[in-house]
Amino acid sequence: MASEYEKMIAGDYYRPADPELRALAKASREKQEAFNQEVDPKKGAAIIKEWFGSTGENLYLNRQVLVDYGVNIHLGENFYANYNLTMLDICPITIGNNAMIGPNCQFLTPLHPLDP
């Protein structure tokens, strides 16, 4: 049987209150708080590399960054994001090399049931 995490990233119905998902979300909130308070770009990049599923070597993200889990986000080489990036990574988000993201961009993967 698939875990709630496996169901979630497959786009199936899942229980967000699952202990594994709650632990991932809590860890993500802690890293989010640390990143959004960090003023040193190198330390900020180190937090992102620890937080996200994978990243290239060269990346720069301005604050505020808001995500659900972080582990489902994959960034290529030479990634830049301007202010107020939101990435709701219920399902994987993959951005390739040499990407520049403007201010106030949102990558939203959740989809709530449309049929009762």
PLM segments and residue spans:
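Flexible, glycine/small-residue-enriched loop-and-beta-strand segment within the central core
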Residues: 65-75, 80-116
